[in-house]
Protein backbone atom coordinates (compact mmCIF):
# COMPACT_ATOMS: atom_id res chain seq x y z
CA UNK A 1 0.00 0.00 0.00
CA UNK A 2 1.22 3.47 -0.85
CA UNK A 3 0.90 6.36 1.54
CA UNK A 4 -0.35 8.76 -1.08
CA UNK A 5 -2.38 8.41 -4.25
CA UNK A 6 -0.61 8.98 -7.57
CA UNK A 7 -1.75 11.70 -9.90
CA UNK A 8 -3.60 9.36 -12.23
CA UNK A 9 -4.71 5.75 -12.33
CA UNK A 10 -5.65 3.26 -14.96
CA UNK A 11 -6.86 -0.31 -15.30
CA UNK A 12 -6.93 -2.90 -18.01
CA UNK A 13 -10.36 -4.13 -16.89
CA UNK A 14 -12.76 -4.31 -19.83
CA UNK A 15 -16.33 -5.35 -20.55
CA UNK A 16 -18.54 -6.06 -17.56
CA UNK A 17 -15.47 -6.00 -15.30
CA UNK A 18 -14.78 -2.37 -16.24
CA UNK A 19 -16.85 -1.00 -13.34
CA UNK A 20 -14.52 -2.85 -10.97
CA UNK A 21 -11.40 -1.38 -12.58
CA UNK A 22 -10.95 1.55 -10.17
CA UNK A 23 -12.60 1.12 -6.79
CA UNK A 24 -12.67 4.12 -4.44
CA UNK A 25 -13.53 3.26 -0.82
CA UNK A 26 -14.79 5.93 1.58
CA UNK A 27 -13.40 5.68 5.13
CA UNK A 28 -15.17 7.80 7.77
CA UNK A 29 -14.06 6.46 11.14
CA UNK A 30 -16.91 3.94 11.52
CA UNK A 31 -16.76 0.11 11.48
CA UNK A 32 -18.97 0.11 8.38
CA UNK A 33 -16.02 1.61 6.49
CA UNK A 34 -14.05 -1.57 7.08
CA UNK A 35 -16.87 -3.61 5.57
CA UNK A 36 -16.80 -1.39 2.48
CA UNK A 37 -13.04 -1.82 2.19
CA UNK A 38 -13.22 -5.61 2.51
CA UNK A 39 -16.01 -5.95 -0.04
CA UNK A 40 -14.37 -3.48 -2.40
CA UNK A 41 -11.30 -5.70 -2.34
CA UNK A 42 -13.40 -8.75 -3.23
CA UNK A 43 -15.12 -7.21 -6.27
CA UNK A 44 -12.04 -5.34 -7.59
CA UNK A 45 -11.04 -6.59 -11.04
CA UNK A 46 -7.93 -8.82 -11.13
CA UNK A 47 -5.85 -6.00 -12.59
CA UNK A 48 -7.93 -3.25 -11.00
CA UNK A 49 -6.93 -0.34 -8.76
CA UNK A 50 -8.27 0.12 -5.23
CA UNK A 51 -7.89 3.36 -3.32
CA UNK A 52 -8.80 4.15 0.29
CA UNK A 53 -9.92 7.73 0.91
CA UNK A 54 -10.31 8.56 4.60
CA UNK A 55 -12.17 11.78 5.39
CA UNK A 56 -12.28 13.36 8.84
CA UNK A 57 -15.49 15.40 8.87
CA UNK A 58 -14.11 17.93 11.31
CA UNK A 59 -17.05 20.30 10.97
CA UNK A 60 -19.05 17.82 13.06
CA UNK A 61 -16.81 18.53 16.06
CA UNK A 62 -18.38 21.99 16.37
CA UNK A 63 -21.53 20.31 17.69
CA UNK A 64 -19.60 19.47 20.88
CA UNK A 65 -19.62 23.13 21.97
CA UNK A 66 -16.92 23.89 24.53
CA UNK A 67 -15.49 20.40 23.99
CA UNK A 68 -15.10 20.98 20.25
CA UNK A 69 -11.30 20.89 20.32
CA UNK A 70 -11.27 17.54 22.11
CA UNK A 71 -13.98 16.20 19.81
CA UNK A 72 -11.97 17.30 16.78
CA UNK A 73 -8.88 15.49 18.01
CA UNK A 74 -10.89 12.34 18.70
CA UNK A 75 -12.58 12.47 15.31
CA UNK A 76 -9.28 12.77 13.45
CA UNK A 77 -7.73 10.00 15.54
CA UNK A 78 -10.67 7.65 14.94
CA UNK A 79 -10.58 8.25 11.20
CA UNK A 80 -6.83 7.66 11.06
CA UNK A 81 -7.26 4.45 13.05
CA UNK A 82 -9.97 3.19 10.68
CA UNK A 83 -7.75 3.96 7.70
CA UNK A 84 -4.90 1.98 9.26
CA UNK A 85 -7.22 -0.98 9.90
CA UNK A 86 -8.62 -0.83 6.38
CA UNK A 87 -5.09 -0.80 4.97
CA UNK A 88 -4.33 -3.98 6.92
CA UNK A 89 -7.57 -5.60 5.77
CA UNK A 90 -7.27 -5.00 2.03
CA UNK A 91 -4.32 -4.75 -0.34
CA UNK A 92 -4.89 -1.16 -1.45
CA UNK A 93 -2.90 0.49 -4.22
CA UNK A 94 -3.19 3.87 -2.52
CA UNK A 95 -4.46 5.35 0.73
CA UNK A 96 -4.71 8.87 2.02
CA UNK A 97 -6.51 11.00 4.56
CA UNK A 98 -8.03 14.44 4.27
CA UNK A 99 -10.83 16.48 5.85
CA UNK A 100 -14.14 17.77 4.55
CA UNK A 101 -17.41 16.14 3.49
CA UNK A 102 -16.97 12.44 2.71
CA UNK A 103 -19.47 12.08 -0.12
CA UNK A 104 -18.51 15.36 -1.79
CA UNK A 105 -14.85 14.39 -1.77
CA UNK A 106 -15.65 10.91 -3.08
CA UNK A 107 -17.66 12.43 -5.92
CA UNK A 108 -14.89 14.92 -6.69
CA UNK A 109 -12.30 12.13 -6.74
CA UNK A 110 -14.56 9.98 -8.90
CA UNK A 111 -14.76 12.74 -11.51
CA UNK A 112 -11.14 13.86 -11.25
CA UNK A 113 -9.49 10.46 -11.25
CA UNK A 114 -11.98 8.40 -13.23
CA UNK A 115 -13.04 6.00 -10.48
CA UNK A 116 -15.56 3.47 -11.75
CA UNK A 117 -17.01 2.30 -8.42
CA UNK A 118 -17.44 3.99 -5.05
CA UNK A 119 -17.78 1.71 -2.01
CA UNK A 120 -19.31 3.07 1.17
CA UNK A 121 -20.58 1.45 4.36
CA UNK A 122 -24.21 1.79 5.37
CA UNK A 123 -25.40 2.17 8.94
CA UNK A 124 -28.40 0.14 10.14
CA UNK A 125 -31.35 2.44 9.48
CA UNK A 126 -34.45 2.41 7.32
CA UNK A 127 -35.23 4.47 4.24
CA UNK A 128 -37.50 7.00 5.98
CA UNK A 129 -34.96 7.83 8.68
CA UNK A 130 -32.18 7.98 6.08
CA UNK A 131 -34.15 10.43 3.94
CA UNK A 132 -35.21 12.46 6.99
CA UNK A 133 -31.92 12.70 8.83
CA UNK A 134 -29.50 12.08 5.97
CA UNK A 135 -26.34 10.04 6.02
CA UNK A 136 -23.44 9.13 3.80
CA UNK A 137 -25.32 6.29 2.15
CA UNK A 138 -28.34 8.33 1.07
CA UNK A 139 -26.09 11.22 -0.01
CA UNK A 140 -24.04 8.82 -2.10
CA UNK A 141 -27.17 7.34 -3.68
CA UNK A 142 -28.29 10.81 -4.76
CA UNK A 143 -24.99 12.42 -5.70
CA UNK A 144 -22.60 9.83 -7.15
CA UNK A 145 -22.38 9.61 -10.91
CA UNK A 146 -20.62 6.25 -11.09
CA UNK A 147 -21.59 2.79 -9.88
CA UNK A 148 -21.95 2.42 -6.13
CA UNK A 149 -21.46 -0.41 -3.63
CA UNK A 150 -23.55 0.05 -0.50
CA UNK A 151 -21.79 -2.32 1.89
CA UNK A 152 -23.37 -4.18 4.81
CA UNK A 153 -21.79 -6.88 7.02
CA UNK A 154 -22.38 -10.41 5.75
CA UNK A 155 -19.43 -11.17 3.46
CA UNK A 156 -15.98 -9.85 2.69
CA UNK A 157 -13.10 -10.48 2.63
CA UNK A 158 -14.77 -13.67 1.36
CA UNK A 159 -17.12 -13.78 -1.64
CA UNK A 160 -20.90 -13.42 -1.20
CA UNK A 161 -23.03 -16.56 -0.87
CA UNK A 162 -24.84 -15.70 -4.09
CA UNK A 163 -25.64 -12.75 -6.32
CA UNK A 164 -29.28 -11.69 -6.71
CA UNK A 165 -30.10 -9.55 -9.75
CA UNK A 166 -33.19 -7.41 -10.28
CA UNK A 167 -34.58 -8.04 -13.79
CA UNK A 168 -37.42 -6.08 -15.41
CA UNK A 169 -36.56 -5.77 -19.10
CA UNK A 170 -35.16 -2.22 -18.87
CA UNK A 171 -31.72 -1.23 -20.21
CA UNK A 172 -30.62 -0.54 -16.63
CA UNK A 173 -31.64 -4.03 -15.51
CA UNK A 174 -29.87 -5.57 -18.51
CA UNK A 175 -26.65 -3.76 -17.60
CA UNK A 176 -26.99 -4.96 -14.00
CA UNK A 177 -27.53 -8.55 -15.11
CA UNK A 178 -24.48 -8.51 -17.38
CA UNK A 179 -22.34 -7.18 -14.52
CA UNK A 180 -23.85 -9.58 -11.99
CA UNK A 181 -23.32 -12.64 -14.18
CA UNK A 182 -19.75 -11.62 -15.00
CA UNK A 183 -18.94 -11.03 -11.33
CA UNK A 184 -20.55 -14.32 -10.35
CA UNK A 185 -18.47 -16.21 -12.91
CA UNK A 186 -15.28 -14.54 -11.69
CA UNK A 187 -15.96 -15.13 -7.99
CA UNK A 188 -17.56 -18.55 -8.40
CA UNK A 189 -20.95 -17.47 -7.01
CA UNK A 190 -24.42 -18.62 -8.03
CA UNK A 191 -26.39 -15.87 -9.78
CA UNK A 192 -30.15 -15.61 -9.28
CA UNK A 193 -32.04 -13.28 -11.66
CA UNK A 194 -35.37 -12.31 -10.08
CA UNK A 195 -38.42 -11.55 -12.24
CA UNK A 196 -41.66 -10.19 -10.80
CA UNK A 197 -44.91 -11.52 -12.28
CA UNK A 198 -46.86 -8.46 -11.14
CA UNK A 199 -48.38 -6.55 -14.04
CA UNK A 200 -47.43 -7.05 -17.68
CA UNK A 201 -44.23 -9.10 -17.89
CA UNK A 202 -41.82 -8.27 -20.71
CA UNK A 203 -41.48 -11.45 -22.78
CA UNK A 204 -37.79 -10.68 -23.19
CA UNK A 205 -37.09 -11.35 -19.52
CA UNK A 206 -38.46 -14.89 -19.87
CA UNK A 207 -36.18 -15.85 -22.75
CA UNK A 208 -34.85 -19.41 -22.94
CA UNK A 209 -31.27 -18.56 -21.95
CA UNK A 210 -32.52 -17.21 -18.61
CA UNK A 211 -33.72 -20.58 -17.36
CA UNK A 212 -32.16 -19.86 -13.96
CA UNK A 213 -34.58 -16.99 -13.28
CA UNK A 214 -36.66 -16.95 -10.12
CA UNK A 215 -40.25 -16.00 -10.99
CA UNK A 216 -41.98 -14.36 -8.05
CA UNK A 217 -45.64 -13.26 -7.73
CA UNK A 218 -44.71 -10.32 -5.49
CA UNK A 219 -43.70 -6.80 -6.62
CA UNK A 220 -40.08 -6.63 -7.76
CA UNK A 221 -38.68 -4.93 -4.65
CA UNK A 222 -40.23 -7.53 -2.36
CA UNK A 223 -39.20 -10.35 -4.70
CA UNK A 224 -35.56 -9.28 -4.86
CA UNK A 225 -35.28 -8.69 -1.13
CA UNK A 226 -37.06 -11.97 -0.41
CA UNK A 227 -34.58 -13.89 -2.59
CA UNK A 228 -31.61 -12.48 -0.69
CA UNK A 229 -30.05 -13.17 2.68
CA UNK A 230 -27.47 -11.37 4.81
CA UNK A 231 -24.59 -13.04 2.98
CA UNK A 232 -25.79 -12.11 -0.52
CA UNK A 233 -25.04 -9.28 -2.92
CA UNK A 234 -27.98 -7.65 -4.68
CA UNK A 235 -27.22 -6.08 -8.07
CA UNK A 236 -29.61 -3.47 -9.42
CA UNK A 237 -29.33 -1.04 -12.33
CA UNK A 238 -30.09 2.66 -12.41
CA UNK A 239 -30.21 5.31 -15.10
CA UNK A 240 -29.90 9.06 -15.14
CA UNK A 241 -31.43 11.48 -17.60
CA UNK A 242 -29.10 14.08 -19.00
CA UNK A 243 -29.19 17.32 -17.04
CA UNK A 244 -31.14 15.81 -14.15
CA UNK A 245 -30.00 14.66 -10.76
CA UNK A 246 -30.85 11.02 -10.25
CA UNK A 247 -33.42 10.17 -7.60
CA UNK A 248 -34.14 6.47 -7.86
CA UNK A 249 -37.04 5.59 -5.58
CA UNK A 250 -36.97 1.97 -6.76
CA UNK A 251 -33.27 1.62 -6.02
CA UNK A 252 -33.66 3.35 -2.64
CA UNK A 253 -36.39 0.90 -1.70
CA UNK A 254 -34.12 -2.01 -2.59
CA UNK A 255 -31.19 -0.55 -0.64
CA UNK A 256 -33.17 0.16 2.54
CA UNK A 257 -35.30 -2.99 2.47
CA UNK A 258 -32.38 -5.36 1.94
CA UNK A 259 -30.39 -7.03 4.71
CA UNK A 260 -27.30 -7.36 2.53
CA UNK A 261 -24.95 -5.28 0.41
CA UNK A 262 -26.31 -3.72 -2.79
CA UNK A 263 -24.33 -2.98 -5.95
CA UNK A 264 -25.96 -0.15 -7.92
CA UNK A 265 -24.80 -0.34 -11.54
CA UNK A 266 -24.82 3.03 -13.27
CA UNK A 267 -26.27 2.94 -16.78
CA UNK A 268 -25.11 6.06 -18.59
CA UNK A 269 -27.68 7.96 -20.71
CA UNK A 270 -27.55 7.55 -24.45
CA UNK A 271 -25.89 10.32 -26.40
CA UNK A 272 -28.36 12.77 -27.96
CA UNK A 273 -29.07 12.22 -31.63
Q: Which residues does each predicted region cover?
A:
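Short beta-strand elements of ligand-binding domains
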Residues: 119-122, 147-153, 262-266
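CheY-like receiver
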Residues: 105, 109, 113, 223-227
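Helix-enriched interaction subdomains in cytosolic or periplasmic regions
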Residues: 1-7, 15-19, 110-146
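Active-site phosphate/pyrophosphate- and oxyanion-stabilizing loops and adjacent acidic/basic residues
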Residues: 38, 84, 107, 138, ...
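Glycine-rich, Arg-bearing micro-motifs that act as flexible, cationic patches
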Residues: 20, 120-139, 160, 236-257, ...
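Charged docking surfaces used in two-component/phosphorelay signaling
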Residues: 96-105, 214-222
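A short acidic, glycine-rich active-site loop
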Residues: 69-81
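Small/aliphatic-rich secondary-structure junction motif
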Residues: 15-69, 92-94, 159-214, 226-233, ...
Amino acid sequence: MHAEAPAATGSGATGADAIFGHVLVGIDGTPESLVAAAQGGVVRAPDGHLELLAVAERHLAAQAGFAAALADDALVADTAAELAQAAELVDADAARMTSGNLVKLLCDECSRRGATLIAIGVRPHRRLSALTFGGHDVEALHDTRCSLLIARPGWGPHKPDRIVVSVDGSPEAHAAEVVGRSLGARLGCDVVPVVSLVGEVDAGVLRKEREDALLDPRPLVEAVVGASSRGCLIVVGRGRQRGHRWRGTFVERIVYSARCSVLVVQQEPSAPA
